[in-house]
Amino acid sequence: VKGAEAMGQGHGWEGAVLKLLRGKDFVFTVTGAEQVTEHYRRVHLTDGGMLAVTGVHPTMWVRLWFEAAGKPHQRAYTLVDPDPAAGTFSLEFALHDGHASDWARTAKPGDTIEATVQGTAFTEPDPAPSHILAIGDPASLPAINSLLTALPSTPTTIWFETPTEAVETAETAGAAPELQASVSVATSRPDAGPSAAAPVAIRSDVVEDEAGSAVEPAGHGAGAAVLSGAQDPSDGVRDRAAVPIPTPGAGGLPLRLDPAHHDFRPIARQDAGARLITQVKADAPALLAETPDPYVWIACDTATTRSLAAYFRKELGLPKHRMHALGYWRP
């Protein structure tokens, strides 16, 4: 306990606030890393006892602490394939210039990093979605995977914003090997017991925009953590077999798609997200009209997220409880 208290005191005013909000501190240890693509890296870690304390739920995320100019800063990342029994999980990073990416690029076995758990939770929409409309980009890829894993048989349309060259290459050259995505097929294990369930999360550092939807002010990492592989609290542990299939526009990223249920629509990023907004507005009205209980999930840059959240609430009349919107990064 003393060690955790000292850790929290070393995190500056942000750490002090999280401590007041009953945040729990842990130290993770790196066990390995792999370069998924040139700009996307996966780091494997042990949890420092975290999962035994917190349990696991879909889209679960943690706050990692990085030092910049002698001051601590926290960034949030979604857990990938958390295993409470083994005390392990992975994190995925969309690499760019910044202290979090610098750490991920050089992370090696034995390295440690401090983390705080506060604010993460998951509440399955009620009634259950008849169709999910998910809108994201590489920063929110882990959370998209997590959502798909939690509701594997729900029809889902995914608008995925990518760097321009990824979509252009796919459109002109077909599904080249470097653009294939690793897709996981989830199958229930009847012998697996239920995982610890925990009651999408409105975070302490999230503010509501003019549409009444939660939009994080800054810095959800890189992706904010992928929840690909998190356990479904109702179904227990799931096995996942990676099946590489052509996914034009994915840029080689590890999307966990099921062609029987998921409609993947890559959109090249142009005009600071304007092209994505235009495409979603063109597609969404018909999709919403076709389904009785839609659920909209948005996790793009803050400006795009605010614009789309306002569109669904004000222009399409979507009830607030049928939408989850978080800005993951600032352009």
Model-derived regions, located:
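Extended, composition-driven regions rather than compact fold-specific motifs
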Residues: 2-174, 183-186, 200-202, 206-210, ...
